[in-house]
Amino acid sequence: CKKCQLEEACPIHAAKKNTDGKLEIDVELCNHCGRCIGKCPFHCNDEGVDGYKVYVGGRWGKKIAHGQMLHKIFTDKNEVLDTVEKAILLFRSAGESGERFADTINRIGFANAEKILLSDELLQKKAEILGLDVVGGATC
């Protein structure tokens, strides 16, 4: 094609034609927004899968923090709910008294938190974590 509709639809320019004129998608750059799905009149990219992005560590208030996206696109709603449960278990097990979840993520490091959240380690220790004697008290 002279003008690739997928390339035109990509807001971050991850879809580009190479020197041979064939479309390539830079998987490191692509944020999986789905805007390119169904744009080709020749149906080269019609098959898309709906998914969910999960962000952790965000915070509103006086000390705003932007959440960071886990490097996985979840395609199953139950898997997302499990990840939310794991985030709560992570906060309960690794959070310190008076600390917000965003602070916990910053303290243990996003890469470490992501590794833990994408494993089933916390769900296996759920009863133990729920049995912990913890003290809340986060302040704004």
Regions found by a protein language model. Give the residues of each.
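Acidic, Ser/Thr-rich low-complexity intrinsically disordered segments
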Residues: 6, 120-140
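Short glycine/threonine-rich loop-to-helix capping motif typified by GTGT followed
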Residues: 105-122
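Short beta-strand elements
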Residues: 52-60
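Iron-sulfur cluster-binding cysteine motifs and their immediate structural context
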Residues: 2-23, 35-52
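Short Fe-S-cluster ligation motifs
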Residues: 27-45, 65-78
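Flexible, glycine/charged-enriched surface loops at secondary-structure junctions
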Residues: 93-107, 124-132
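A hydrophobic, small-residue-rich beta->alpha segment in the mid-to-C-terminal subdomain
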Residues: 60-97
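Generic secondary-structure signature for well-ordered alpha-helical cores
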Residues: 15, 35-38, 45, 85-97, ...
